[in-house]
Amino acid sequence: MQTLNTTSLKIVDNQLWILDQQALPQEKCWRPCPDVASLVEHIQTLRVRGAPLIGLSASLLLALLAEKGLSQAELAQALETLRASRPTAVNLMNNLDRMKLALAQPQFVAALVQEALRLVEEDRALCERIADHGAALVKPNSRLLTHCNTGGLATAGIGTAIGVLLRAHQQGKVTQVWVDETRPLLQGGRLTAWELGELGIPYQLICDSMAASLMAQGQVDAIWVGADRIAANGDVANKIGTYSLAVLAHYHQIPFYVAAPHTTHDPACPDGRAIPIEQRAAAEVTGVSGSFGHCQWAPQNAAVYNPAFDVTPAALISGWVLDTGVVTPQDVKEGIFQNTLK
């Protein structure tokens, strides 16, 4: 396969490498990904994260394994193993559905390679269109708040919600970005703060619990988040803490926007109650680990509830900003998400 470079994925000498997002920002560490077991581990430990990126990494690995000579039966098994690695992120399922169709072709090796590379290029283009649509909604001198990480680290392009912030910044509209640290794994503090700094976008990092105070003071003009799955009724699954922000935004009458590619939409999922929510290890809440080391602050035997995602009801969302355009609450009431988006 040809050499490929994105912010978080690269292919060099027919080997997939992933940027270890658990090591950032202290260390920029690229890790090899030679087989399915290694990628599943990288996904489940969040070295690879972000709904679009998870789907792309799985697709690229399948194509590389096909080039290395795995049979159709072996690739089919690999595909299903990868499908089970992160149940909430529907981009993974959608990408693998397309790779499964390619695998059924007589010339399946070439078909898999072509489809994987097509998915990467499509994602780059999707990000650009999301940014354009979203930036049109950003008013001059805006102070924006974002949650988790939705930039180039999570996609093949400039990102979803962060892509909107970047485009609006390039247009001179952004005064300030408030970055939620995003407990328990600190994707906002570790990743979004790093990305915004690299992009030259002015930001300030806050604890998640500080967002309400900022809104009450009139310091937030709009909230921009990403999505891991959009249900047929417009409900959105995203990083835990997103729902809290949506409730706060609704109370303070602040626009709350979801930026995502149309591939995050799942018309087969009727509403948020049908979205599987991944439960993660207690150690993520009782302490913290990273390239900086490990610290535990809770009692060793503390009982922990640690869902990776929550669901924001459609009624709390001001707009779904997709590559296909901006979906309004009225569009949702009329059933736009009931069918496949194109």
Curated annotation (Swiss-Prot):
<protein>
    <recommendedName>
        <fullName>Methylthioribose-1-phosphate isomerase</fullName>
        <ecNumber>5.3.1.23</ecNumber>
    </recommendedName>
</protein>
<comment type="similarity">
    <text>Belongs to the eIF-2B alpha/beta/delta subunits family. MtnA subfamily.</text>
</comment>
<dbReference type="InterPro" id="IPR037171">
    <property type="entry name" value="NagB/RpiA_transferase-like"/>
</dbReference>
<keyword id="KW-0413">Isomerase</keyword>
<feature type="active site" description="Proton donor">
    <location>
        <position position="228"/>
    </location>
</feature>
<dbReference type="GO" id="GO:0019509">
    <property type="term" value="P:L-methionine salvage from methylthioadenosine"/>
</dbReference>
<dbReference type="InterPro" id="IPR000649">
    <property type="entry name" value="IF-2B-related"/>
</dbReference>
<dbReference type="InterPro" id="IPR005251">
    <property type="entry name" value="IF-M1Pi"/>
</dbReference>
<dbReference type="GO" id="GO:0046523">
    <property type="term" value="F:S-methyl-5-thioribose-1-phosphate isomerase activity"/>
</dbReference>
<comment type="function">
    <text>Catalyzes the interconversion of methylthioribose-1-phosphate (MTR-1-P) into methylthioribulose-1-phosphate (MTRu-1-P).</text>
</comment>
<feature type="binding site">
    <location>
        <begin position="238"/>
        <end position="239"/>
    </location>
    <ligand>
        <name>substrate</name>
    </ligand>
</feature>
<feature type="binding site">
    <location>
        <position position="86"/>
    </location>
    <ligand>
        <name>substrate</name>
    </ligand>
</feature>
<dbReference type="InterPro" id="IPR011559">
    <property type="entry name" value="Initiation_fac_2B_a/b/d"/>
</dbReference>
<comment type="pathway">
    <text>Amino-acid biosynthesis; L-methionine biosynthesis via salvage pathway; L-methionine from S-methyl-5-thio-alpha-D-ribose 1-phosphate: step 1/6.</text>
</comment>
<keyword id="KW-0028">Amino-acid biosynthesis</keyword>
<dbReference type="InterPro" id="IPR027363">
    <property type="entry name" value="M1Pi_N"/>
</dbReference>
<feature type="binding site">
    <location>
        <position position="187"/>
    </location>
    <ligand>
        <name>substrate</name>
    </ligand>
</feature>
<feature type="binding site">
    <location>
        <begin position="49"/>
        <end position="51"/>
    </location>
    <ligand>
        <name>substrate</name>
    </ligand>
</feature>
<feature type="site" description="Transition state stabilizer">
    <location>
        <position position="148"/>
    </location>
</feature>
<dbReference type="InterPro" id="IPR042529">
    <property type="entry name" value="IF_2B-like_C"/>
</dbReference>
<keyword id="KW-0486">Methionine biosynthesis</keyword>
<dbReference type="Pfam" id="PF01008">
    <property type="entry name" value="IF-2B"/>
</dbReference>
